[in-house]
């Protein structure tokens, strides 16, 4: 095989390695930002709240799919989040068999608090990177988030209530 055929693979490997390294940093930041709410919600429950904050009210099947859990698991998790007043359920007007769940004010406050802590720590880290490199990073991370199907920060819904 020629070195030409290996070059894209080696470049790809270096990109994957760099993203893995950065992901370790971001996982640590995420873990620290969740520490204050660890007794209130699990990581999967928090991810559920984030999905509702970013995508708005969801039916249980769509929510289960977005979070990556079985529908029965999503139902039990939503039961717990309803009891904690972090989400609420409402029956669809057009089809009373369909339930939609949405954040409550308390749920939105929890997501905002965790996101605020995460934002502060990421800002502190970013202050260590030269401004011109930050611009390149913004573009690259935006593409990464888009490729992964993540809703951009500026597009998070403000209509989180049912």
Residue ranges and their predicted role:
Residues 8-15, 37, 64, 70, ...:
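Residue-level recognition of alpha-helical structural elements
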Residues 79-142:
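Charged, amphipathic alpha-helical coiled-coil/dimerization segments
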Residues 21, 47-50, 109:
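Pre-recognition alpha-helix immediately N-terminal to the DNA-recognition helix
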Residues 28-73, 84, 156:
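N-terminal helix-turn-helix DNA-binding core of bacterial DNA-binding proteins
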